[in-house]
Structures are given as structure tokens and as C-alpha cells.
């Protein structure tokens, strides 16, 4: 990413046909921007008009307010946002004549993160009811910030809609997984993240409740194995936010 603008990323490695920086598109009114990108929240459009420093401080505080208080998470987020060079709102168009989509971007020195618009509280509740799985509260709270989030070039954390599709794909493999020599039923696993171009998922695991809610483990679809929390450096995490810290580092 060094030397590349966010626009360059979208129209280059990001594979988008067109991208617009709302920070720079001073001639674009709210009505015109919403017409281009129907999923653009009014708050994001207003945020794009603020000074860069104010915008960064606002979104950092928004993360703090949206997520449950955990000292180590707040400490990490302070460090993460101290390394963010700029945040912005962009409208990106995948194909000519298709609608643009809204993204919130976080640019660091050597990487970029992109988030899609958040869910409303009633949408989070609807999503929770639609999934027959004990979703952790910290994971659900993240949808207040972004409904879909990824490092540039990665598939990333699924949106609520994509999660349903990915789960179907994940469940098509009828064989079970293995945790060491123990067989694990795929029904116990719920994928929430996929590594781009690989059959590597991060999944909630219903048989592991380390902190009162389900933990998450690395799952290899090709090898049919999941990581063990009983060993060091196996990418098994007691909470969604612990995994998110790993992803943002």
C-alpha cells in the first residue's frame, strides 16, 4: 500500500470499476451521494465532511461506545487508532452501470481496512433470531460498527447476509472435522471469517465456552482439522474481540 492512495487500491487490487472519495467530492450533495450508493448512511456522509483529525477521533470513540468494555481491548484500540494515518468514506462501483457501495476505510502505514455500513439495532436482533446458534454478544455488537469488515485484499469478516451463504457452503462438506483425534460435527461450527482464496475459516465452536460464551477456532476445510486451544499459537481465541485484536495487529 505504500505510495498508493485508497482510490488506487479500489480501482487496482480491489477490483472496482470506479471509486469516489466523499472527502474530496465537495460538489456531491447528500441526495446525489445516496442516489449513487443506496446503502450510504447519512451519518457517514456527514462524517466525511469533518476535518481529518476530528473524523478519526469521532470514529475511534464510536468503536469504544459500540463494544463492551474490556480493558485489554480498549488498550489495544487506543494503540491501533494511534497508528491510523487517515479514515475516510468512499463509494466504490464494482461494474459499470451498477450501484456504488459505501465503505469506511482505515489507512495505516502498511495496510488498509475496509468496513461496510453497520446494522441498526432492530436488524441485529433480527439477524440474531435468524441464526440458530448462540452468537456471542461482542460479535453482535461489532455489527453496530460494520456489517462486513476486511483487510485490503482479504475476504474478511462476513456480513450478516454473506454469513448465511458461507454457512451453507461450509456445511456442504458432509465429513466431520477433527480436533486432535476427536471427531467434531460441522453443526457445532459457525464460520464468521474466511481468508481470501483459501479454505481457511475462523469459526465459533459450540463445544467450547471459555468465557461464558462460545470461543472460536481456526478451521481448515481441506484438511478437516480445527485448532486446539490447549496448545500455544494455534489461533484459537476465547472471545471474538480477542480474535479481532489478532486480525488488526
Indicate where each model-derived feature is located.
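Exposed alpha-helical structural elements
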Residues: 5, 72, 123-126, 138, ...
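Membrane topogenic helices and adjacent juxtamembrane segments
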Residues: 1-106
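Extracellular-facing segments of soluble proteins and assemblies that are Gly/Ser/Thr-biased and enriched
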Residues: 95-159
Amino acid at each position: 500500500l505504500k505510495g498508493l492512495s485508497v482510490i488506487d487500491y479500489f480501482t487496482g487490487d480491489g477490483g472496482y470499476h470506479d471509486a469516489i472519495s466523499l472527502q474530496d467530492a465537495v460538489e456531491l450533495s447528500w441526495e446525489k451521494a445516496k442516489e449513487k450508493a443506496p446503502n450510504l448512511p447519512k451519518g457517514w456522509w456527514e462524517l466525511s465532511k469533518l476535518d481529518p483529525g476530528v473524523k478519526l477521533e469521532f470514529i475511534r470513540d464510536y468503536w469504544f461506545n459500540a463494544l463492551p468494555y474490556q480493558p485489554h481491548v480498549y488498550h489495544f484500540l487506543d494503540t491501533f487508532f494511534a497508528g491510523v494515518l487517515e479514515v475516510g468514506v468512499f463509494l466504490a462501483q464494482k461494474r459499470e452501470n451498477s450501484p456504488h457501495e459505501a465503505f469506511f476505510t482505515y489507512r495505516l502505514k502498511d495496510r488498509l481496512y475496509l468496513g461496510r455500513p453497520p446494522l441498526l439495532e432492530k436488524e441485529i436482533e433480527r439477524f440474531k433470531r435468524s441464526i440458530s446458534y448462540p452468537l456471542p454478544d461482542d460479535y453482535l455488537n461489532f455489527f453496530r460498527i460494520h456489517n462486513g469488515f476486511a483487510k485490503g485484499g482479504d475476504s474478511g469478516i462476513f456480513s450478516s447476509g454473506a454469513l448465511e451463504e458461507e454457512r451453507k457452503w461450509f456445511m456442504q462438506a458432509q465429513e466431520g472435522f477433527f480436533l486432535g483425534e476427536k471427531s467434531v460435527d460441522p453443526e457445532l461450527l459457525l464460520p464468521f471469517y474466511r481468508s481470501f482464496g483459501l479454505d481457511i475459516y475462523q469459526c465459533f465452536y459450540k463445544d467450547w465456552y471459555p468465557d461464558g460464551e462460545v470461543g472460536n477456532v481456526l478451521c481448515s476445510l481441506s484438511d478437516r482439522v480445527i485448532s486446539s486451544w490447549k496448545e500455544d499459537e494455534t489461533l484459537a481465541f476465547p472471545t471474538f474481540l480477542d480474535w479481532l485484536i489478532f486480525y488488526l495487529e
